[in-house]
Amino acid sequence: MKIINPYTEILTPLDGQAILQHIELCGRVCYKSEDKITDTSAAKFVAGIIKRGHEAVLEHFDITVKFVCDRGVSHEIVRHRMASYCQESTRYCNYSKDVFGSEITVIRPSFLTEGTPGWQYWKVACRMAEKSYFELLDWGCTPQEA
């Protein structure tokens, strides 16, 4: 069993100036002021729409972010459906395979301190879950069922 810290990774290559220019172009449609676009107008324009509370214009740029977090946290994120999500799936991932190192990966809980009794109980529970998962696979269950 591998214990890891939660983390995020931005997968979209980001160019700050290009992002600002794209948002400016979209936002200026609202104000019919496309003719005011210059090489240096984007940052000031975007700051202005934020100051005016016109944040919807910011939605015209998207990024892809990889979240590695507790399943409960990921379910809170996707529940709000403010974006599109892809998530590691127990339906399609068989953790007994070499690609996973023949082990499950669990996220280190932020609410427990390593070495405390709570930490030890949590770790034992995770090991038992891992053992049960592999036994269910051995008995013929699919990864989704296990």
What are these regions (language model features)?
Residues M1-E145:
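Family-specific signature for flavin-dependent thymidylate synthase
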